[in-house]
């Protein structure tokens, strides 16, 4: 029940203009908004004029959804979100989509994780929409195979999750979205070559891949400014990202039995070479481990123009050779952030096995001054019990500070490494490190325990 201060016998909220009430109801699911119609005559039809609809019909009768939409009287929809199943509901789902399009929805979000239905294809009218500016599709059942010309002439943000689409289908989508600025492809399958050379307005690209959703293996994006590429067993070739200024990488290259020095040079380090104009770079733990192998194999690193570098890693010995060499080849670095998140890593056993097979002495590779740092299993154990020593973190910081000459600021975001006493000890050590290296050193606690899978909210 809505309560509030009374104004001449009328509650304060009910006295607000319709536009404000619509804004309030836009922030709740439509089912909850409809319930406000029972409050009073004033509220009876307010929900039906709200320009934002959020419908969850996974358990609802399709007829009740149709009835709800029939009461809707706003001339235009700013946002339409549909969370549904597809089994025995395809006609109803298509009807909802047609309703949103006919009301010129600017933001359209469709979510369905119903794996009982395979190969669902959107109707042709879905691909002809001049109003939508933001489109989000999350479904393990959707095959994006437009059988007609795509015309999304106002679309600026496109996010596809768990969808299947071919290279041919993707070209149709891109050619029909001339104003596209932001593209997210999260665990999408079958497309292999992502050619964005004709998408002149595209500035931001985010791709998450996995063992089951491999693509793409090639990216051509000369107009791109910001790239986030995460998690894959297959390497991804950056053919043209010449306008890139910001990148976030953590690529898992899979079975080390197939990894050679040539592979490292032509994939891991070559990816760095394509980032030579990037000024803001984030690198994850497994990518750092692969850089360590490249460094130990004597693979030359490119010189980078990075000014702000973020490392998302546990404090383990197997990332140190890669980090220190990377720092030496980043002469203009001004700010280094170390975020000690828990993340996936290649085991020490596999790394050492790789070194032996390539006639490299593991004791020499993990230098004596790096041997004080733990392996991945030891670090995970420390994270669980929070008994890492403050001097271990300080040694890690000192090791990195000695590898860079131009640094102005180091920020350490700690997750679960130290208890309260250890944290206070580290703060004191950081003051000494700051003075000795003429670098501003900041120590902060972080409550993000795992590497994020998405960009920060825009």
Curated annotation (Swiss-Prot):
Keyword Repeat included in the entry's annotation: yes
Domain F-box: start-end pairs: 10-56
Stored SUPFAM superfamilies: F-box domain, RNI-like
Record's keyword terms, sorted: Leucine-rich repeat, Repeat
Tagged with keyword ATP-binding: no
Domain of life: Eukaryota
PROSITE patterns named among the record's database cross-references: FBOX (PS50181)
Residue spans of the LRR repeats: 57-84, 86-112, 133-161, 162-187, 226-251, 260-285, 325-353, 389-414
Protein name: F-box/LRR-repeat protein At5g02910
């Amino acid at each position: 029940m809505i309560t509030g201060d009374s104004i001449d016998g009328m509650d304060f909220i009910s006295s607000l203009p319709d536009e404000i009430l619509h804004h309030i109801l836009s922030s709740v699911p439509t089912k909850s908004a409809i319930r406000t119609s029972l409050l009073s005559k004033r509220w009876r039809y307010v929900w039906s004029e709200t320009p934002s609809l959020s419908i969850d019909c996974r358990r609802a009768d399709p007829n009740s959804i149709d009835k709800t939409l029939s009461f809707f009287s706003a001339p235009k929809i700013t946002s339409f979100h549909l969370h549904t199943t597809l089994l025995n509901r395809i006609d109803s789902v298509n009807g909802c989509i047609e309703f949103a399009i006919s009301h010129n929805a600017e933001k359209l979000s469709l979510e369905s994780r119903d794996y009982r239905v395979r190969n669902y294809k959107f109707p042709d009218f879905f691909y002809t929409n001049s109003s939508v500016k933001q489109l989000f599709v999350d479904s393990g059942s959707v095959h994006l195979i437009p059988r007609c010309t795509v015309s999304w002439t106002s679309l600026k943000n496109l996010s596809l999750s768990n969808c299947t689409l071919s290279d041919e289908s993707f070209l149709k989508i891109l050619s029909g979205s001339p104003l596209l600025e932001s593209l997210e492809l999260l665990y999408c399958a079958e497309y292999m070559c992502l050619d964005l050379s004709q998408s002149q307005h595209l500035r931001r690209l985010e791709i998450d891949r996995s063992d089951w959703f491999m693509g793409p293996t090639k990216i051509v994006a000369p107009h791109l400014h910001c790239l986030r590429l995460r998690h894959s067993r297959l390497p991804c070739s950056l053919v043209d990202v010449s306008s890139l200024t910001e990148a976030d990488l953590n690529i898992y290259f899979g079975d080390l039995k197939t990894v050679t020095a040539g592979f490292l040079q032509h994939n891991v380090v070559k990816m760095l070479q394509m980032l030579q104009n990037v000024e803001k770079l984030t690198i994850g733990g497994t990518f750092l481990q692969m850089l360590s192998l490249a460094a130990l194999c004597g693979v030359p690193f490119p010189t980078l123009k990075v000014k702000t570098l973020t490392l998302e890693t546990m404090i383990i010995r197997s990332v140190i050779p890669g980090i220190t060499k990377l720092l030496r080849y980043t002469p203009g670095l001004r700010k280094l952030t170390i975020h000690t998140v828990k993340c996936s890593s290649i085991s020490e056993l596999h790394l050492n096995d790789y070194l032996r097979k390539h006639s490299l002495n593991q004791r020499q590779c993990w230098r004596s001054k790096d041997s004080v740092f733990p392996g991945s299993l030891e670090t995970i154990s420390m994270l669980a019990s929070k008994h890492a020593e403050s001097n271990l973190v300080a040694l890690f910081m000192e090791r990195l500070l000695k590898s860079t000459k131009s640094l102005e600021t180091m920020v350490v975001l700690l997750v679960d490494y130290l208890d309260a006493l250890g944290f206070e000890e580290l703060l004191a050590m950081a003051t000494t490190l700051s003075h000795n290296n003429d670098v501003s050193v900041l120590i902060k606690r972080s409550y993000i325990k795992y590497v994020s899978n998405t960009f920060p909210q825009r």
